[in-house]
Amino acid sequence: MIGIIINGAILGAIFSLIAVGLNLQYGVTRILNIAHGEFLMLGSYITYIFFTLYGVNPLVSLVISGPIVFILGLLIQIVVFRKLVHVSRSAEELESRSLLACFGLTFIIQNVVAEIFRGTPIISAPYLNVSTDILGEPVPLNMIVAAVMSVIISLVMYLVLRFTSIGLAMRATVEEPAGAQLVGINIFKIHAVSFGIGALLAALAGSMLVMIYSNITPYIGPQYTFIALAVIILGGMGSFIGSLVGGFCIGYVYYISLEIDPLITLAVVYSFLIILLIIRPKGFFGR
């Protein structure tokens, strides 16, 4: 039981961080980025490259993988999604076009990385491969570090959204786009920055994952996109707190099902999600 509580919480912390990025992108831009997991995969590979080739501590590599993927996300929003906003005549048209664009991005990023690495799975960075006892349960230290860092990053993001000018501009853009423009907020710039930050958060989560999981491949992205979608739907679309609560709920469901049979993990997660949505269609914190 202690093992379930600890390991479920560790997974929940990482899942929450992944979902916070996706929820931010959707909340501000109204684009559901189903290529979100590819940014996580890129963060994993960047961390792995710097660790194996240059001996860079995976925690230090956060300041490398994050900015690189932030810039990539920023450019993708400006070059792809901003153009789609301008040429789409309705919200429904933008939704369908952006969905197709996200599918395209998924395959492009996957295939570029697969071509570079020849599709060979990477083995997790051998970082802090020792265990410590928590309430009599041995827990790998790298998993604890990954979980704690995920929580810290999520809390920092919350503080940024609540108490900084960029956070205020993001919230104004979400709540009243026309009013935000009237007071001088460049909502297109806010869209780009928000999308970039969402990609950055996914990359940081990917850096955490490569510390604790082996067999990272160019094709892991969709799995974590589906997990992030489950988290934000459960917590409530557009709700930051919902992402945190939903992340821990899905983390426990995921870990328990993983212990029972790894082949049914995602099926169990989505079955759990469907049952809860029947009871509460808008999620825990949906409005």
Regions found by a protein language model. Name each.
Residues 1-18, 46, 58-61, 88-97, ...:
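Membrane-interfacial amphipathic/re-entrant helices at transmembrane-helix boundaries
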Residues 1-7, 160-165, 194-232, 254-263:
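Inter-helical junctions in multi-pass inner-membrane proteins, predominant
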Residues 2-53, 82, 88-92, 236-237:
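Single transmembrane alpha-helix segments in multi-pass membrane proteins
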Residues 55-105, 245-250, 280-281:
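Alpha-helical transmembrane segments within multi-pass membrane transporters and channels
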Residues 84, 93-163, 190, 256, ...:
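Transmembrane helix-bundle core of multi-pass membrane transporters
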Residues 85-113, 221-233, 262-278:
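Pore- or pathway-lining transmembrane helices of multi-pass membrane proteins that form conduits
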Residues 138-216, 240-246:
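Helix-loop-helix "hairpin" substructures at the membrane interface of multi-pass membrane proteins
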Residues 175-178, 182, 186-189, 261-287:
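Cytosolic-side transmembrane-helix boundaries in multi-pass membrane proteins
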